Amino acid sequence: MSVVSSFHQSWKSLILASQRCNTVKQIKSTHSLFIIHGLHRNTYAISKLLTAFLHLPNLNKHFHYASSIFDSIEIPNSFVYDTMIRICSRSSQPHLGLRYFLLMVKEEEEDIAPSYLTFHFLIVACLKACFFSVGKQIHCWVVKNGVFLSDSHVQTGVLRIYVEDKLLLDARKVFDEIPQPDVVKWDVLMNGYVRCGLGSEGLEVFREMLVKGLEPDEFSVTTALTACAQVGALAQGKWIHEFVKKKSWIESDVFVGTALVDMYAKCGCIETAVEVFKKLTRRNVFSWAALIGGYAAYGYAKKAMTCLERLEREDGIKPDSVVLLGVLAACAHGGFLEEGRSMLENMEARYEITPKHEHYSCIVDLMCRAGRLDDALNLIEKMPMKPLASVWGALLNGCRTHKNVELGELAVKNLLDLEKGNVEEEEAALVQLSNIYFSVQRNPEASKVRGMIEQRGVRKTPGWSVLEVDGNVTKFVSGDVSHPNLLQIHTVIHLLSVDALQIL
């Protein structure tokens, strides 16, 4: 064997060894051999060594080492740049991916240019760093360079930029520019609507996807069920349930099963929610939280508290803050004052969970329901953190129920300080205070507060409700005149009113 052939064989073995590294110790050993054999100047070999960092479980700890290897390369190639941007996107410093991208585009070498992989990794880094404005600039870049229409991963990444920034109109425009979007892209768009509380729009996207002939995956189904839960679309939820049965996803996917439990519970079918829960072959803390939340909403406090014992006993699951919040809410609805107080006081000792504002809000609500407003105020004053609006809001609701003007004024004062600039929340607090004044016949003060509302330019948010008929969810808003079938609706209401008067 010639000397050259021997060198080539050694280099090949070292490069293969670098691809098998899964600990930093192995990477360092291989790097040392690279230096000994002169491979540390070979960009192909170094790119393979850098790729090994992606397999490390504690990448953040060794990010500086990866960066130093990159800095030792005299002229990195495109693959090395791509690898470093990818490492940044996986680390706790994703913003540095932009630095490597800028270094890359400054290179004067003709063969060093961003590819679709570069943009894909860069978009992932921007998403992790919440650099949405940069992501939009990348969108312009990929459109200008023709990458957007040619790569599916880049299309999905750009769509996610707008969805994560909650710019849903722009997200829809981007989506409509994608030729033949796959299920993943439909999922991203639908999830964007649902996360913003626009369940009806999310279901419309789901129906569009079905009309296009695409079959939903587990993620689509989970998101669609969440949308059904938001708007109370029980009929559509049942249809999805039948689809899930055919796919056997209740048994195989815990998130689909959990979404079904949550949907039935929020649509008023707690018994069906329990039946679905019993069929889950695997249950996690979210499954139990959905069931406990359902029990809490319908006042089944004892069943919710029993679930807290069962999840540890049956599944060996440690409750999280959401589960405990559900149990506290159940105690509030059921009037179990002592049990709720005991749980709050022992959360940290028993469950190693520090109570948050929402937990205190539940107990304040519970105390107010029991008429213990002074105790509720005492609890607020002893909180280890500054009370937020949710806590004072719970006290204000109790003051309205029990017509307590003094504490109501205190609660509103704190709410206005906390919600300064939030017009809707300011209006809600002032309306509550005026109602308290009216309830105790203090009409001058009530009128004064109403005047404050008008001076602030606060406009009351109209009430609304949704109704599902034949799978279509319609939103009815108080005072709305924009519905396309307004004339027919008013005609039917008039006829029903006439019939009702005749019956009376």
UniProtKB/Swiss-Prot annotation:
This is Putative pentatricopeptide repeat-containing protein At3g28640. PPR repeats lie at residues 77-107, 115-149, 151-181, 182-216, 217-251, 253-287, 288-319, 320-350, 356-390. GO terms for biological process: RNA modification. GO terms for molecular function: RNA binding. The gene is PCMP-E79. Residues 391-470 are annotated as: Type E motif. It comes from the Eukaryota. InterPro entries: E_motif, Pentatricopeptide_rpt, PPR_At4g14850-like_plant, TPR-like_helical_dom_sf. Residues 471-501 are annotated as: Type E(+) motif. It comes from Arabidopsis thaliana. Signal peptide: none annotated. Belongs to the PPR family. PCMP-E subfamily. Keywords: Repeat.
